Amino acid sequence: MIAAIRRAFIIDRDEFVRLSLSKMLQKYGFTVEEIEDFSQLEGREKDIRGGIVVADVDIEVLEGRLSLLKKWSDRFILTSPLVTEELTLRLKKMGVQHIIKKPVDPRILRKVIRTISFPDGVKVPSLGKKKGGFPLRSERR
């Protein structure tokens, strides 16, 4: 049996941010795909079920895609340079469970990914340190 792969879809206007997120997610074992907008996710339910969506999109875009967002709310990670209590409450009401302030800290992204459950058959490699690598501060003890 061939194990399914984890996919990560990145939506962000900033090329540097997309590159940074792509490198982080590849390091965490994801096959990364950069997409232009939310509409490109339609018909990709199977891929998303076995992966995640990391996006910096306007709240109006999310409001226009509530039906899609509700299907993937547990695997949708919103990134934003401005995270206020008011915005967080509004997003939570829409079903967004994971919000990360930009610039994205790799340790926080990894922590959020660890909270996401992946379906059977989806290969989920360890997110721990690599052999011979230096441990993160939280891993030293």
Per-range role (PLM):
Residues 11-12:
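Conserved acidic carboxylate
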Residues 15-33:
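Two-component/phosphorelay signaling modules centered on CheY-like receiver
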Residues 20, 86, 104-113:
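C-terminal output helix
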Residues 34-52, 59-60:
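Acidic, metal-coordinating helix/loop segments flanking the phosphotransfer/catalytic sites
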Residues 42, 61-74:
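Short amphipathic alpha-helix used as the core "switch/output" element in two-component signaling
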Residues 80-98:
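Alpha4 helix (beta4-alpha4-beta5 surface) of REC/receiver domains from two-component response regulators
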Residues 119-141:
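CheY-like receiver
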